[in-house]
Amino acid sequence: MISATLTGVVASLALSATLLPAAPPVQARSSLERVQVRSSPEEPHECARAVARCDGTLAVPLDWSDSSSERIEVAFAWIPAAERATGTILANPGGPLPALPDVPRIQQVLDPVLDHQNLLVVDPRGLGESSPLLCPGLKLTEPDTIAACSAHLGSRARFFTADQAVHDMEAVRRALGAGPVTFYGNSYGTAFAQAYAARHPEGLAAAFLDSTMVTSADGYALWPMRSRPDLLGLVCDRSRACRALPGDARRTYARLVARLREHPDPEVPLIALRSVERVNEPVFGREVNAAATAYLAGDPEPLRRLARVLAGAPSQPVEGAEWAGYLAYRCGDGSFPFDRDADPAERLDQLERYHLRERPLAPYTPADLGLDVRKSLEFCVNWPTPRRSPVLPPGAALPDVPVMVVGGDFDTHTPAEVGAALRVFPDATLVRVPFGTHSLAWGGGEAGECVRAALRSFVTDRRVPQGRCTAENYRALGAFSLSLAEVAPVPAAGLDAGRRRVLAAAFATAADAVARRNPYNLFHGRLTEQPGLRGGRVTFGNGTITLDEAAFVPRVAVSGQIALTPQGRATASLTVLAAGSPDGRAYGVELAWEAFTAQERPALSGTFDGRHFEARELR
């Protein structure tokens, strides 16, 4: 999320899918600098003989193009295959942050393939245990501390970039005597994978890229600089009910931003609204379009409820000496709407003109989000980048090896952009994951399991597996009902129209509560309780949800308990008291359905006041 102090910007820019980069100015093209990494070290590293995990270090040049350069140490973990090895996986989890702390997670993702695959993880230089860059007092929210950090590190900092780091990785591979690797890159790890492929094609047997960093025309990594209001339309277009809302999703949201700018609502500050449109959170994706329409029509509660969830949400700290390494990569590898050779004052002028001309955060302005273009919008303004160091040099001859690329609809870069960028690889295959977010193989739910299975299959036989992974497990809502009379009845045989409406309102209330337990949720997954939309309370337990006079439809109070299995099977035993019901009394309702499906309404079965019913799904 973007905040006035940029507290959450690093998490959003490095780890989430809420912004998309716009094309920066084209700069002078760079040629690929050839560096010779010794093909045979004087003697193998001691870890080469290990039969269990071996943590080691290797001395490498600070500047690989200068054999007389000072030496630094890079740290690595080498995990030999449990049985006979058929290959080696070189993995980087992204960031750019230390890699070694994520070794257990990488092992969990790869799991059975490590029986026959060695695993190599190298801490990129400048990070973690690899000659870390440190700047005491560094705060990414304070530009002066970034400038001071750059001055403190001096000219050495220019060599802590992906082009140099992949030479280190190659040196470690050779010191261990490992053959060509399958490079598993996640997030920023895909930038390292591309840099490695360009500089050491002989060392690459295959690559699996998850949540790919896209490079500019000059080969530098694009960082997010544009909002994604198009995603509001993507989720709405998949839903019959949402498509029935008045107007176009994108224009409706622009009207909402303008309304809140002109008439501020303390319960929905624009900073919070910017996060509510993050459709990679399933509850937001399910409700944001309907909530925006309701707000503009005079019903603010659905939108306010979404915004309240963000209060007190944890954010990633962005201060500390160790963030210097992050800055070195982000700025040295990155492409921004200013010239690499410009001084900070010129960069600020260029950045300001870019935002005035392109409005990349539209429908917001930087001021809407508490941001000052000249002070707090881009960390790298005060970081010199005198050395040419493209991640993927234009014209580099890339190896003709299998490359599998997975990309989600809601990731930082769209699947289409990723596919277009990676056409430079002769044998790359893009696999789109509908409604997928970032770091797909690390995710939960069926999509995470599916992508992990695809990764394991690809690493094993280097063929892109058949089958389809998807995270699309909901349909966006239509209009919020303001009375029982507005509720579309469930077509349950044996019940009159009034009772069908009560049944529909009861199910809508239960489904609203269950949606908070979608396996892809982040913010809502942390909730232990929440008020009902129109009153009452919902309490979340371990596999259970308790409704206490919870009202999703005004004056329809629902109490009882919902049981939800890990597989998404929901059963509910409820008591429903609805004003305007046929005889004005409470009804007992039993419900059973499959939650988290891409349907307008799943198939329902159960009893209403003791009478059995079944209703087919509505697709």
Where do the PLM segments sit?
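Secretory targeting and sorting signals
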Residues: 1-28
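N-terminal cap/lid subdomain of alpha/beta-hydrolase-fold enzymes
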Residues: 70-146, 409, 420
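A catalytic-pocket lid/entrance helix-loop region that shapes and gates access to the active site
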Residues: 140, 193, 197-255, 289-319, ...
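Conserved acidic catalytic loop of the alpha/beta-hydrolase fold
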Residues: 152-155, 163-180
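Alpha/beta-hydrolase fold active-site neighborhood
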Residues: 250-398, 464, 475-478, 482-601
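Short beta-strand/loop motif that positions the catalytic acidic residue
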Residues: 399, 404-407
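Conserved alpha/beta-hydrolase "acid-adjacent" motif
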Residues: 412-417
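Catalytic active-site module of serine/aspartate enzymes centered on a nucleophile-bearing elbow/loop
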Residues: 434-499
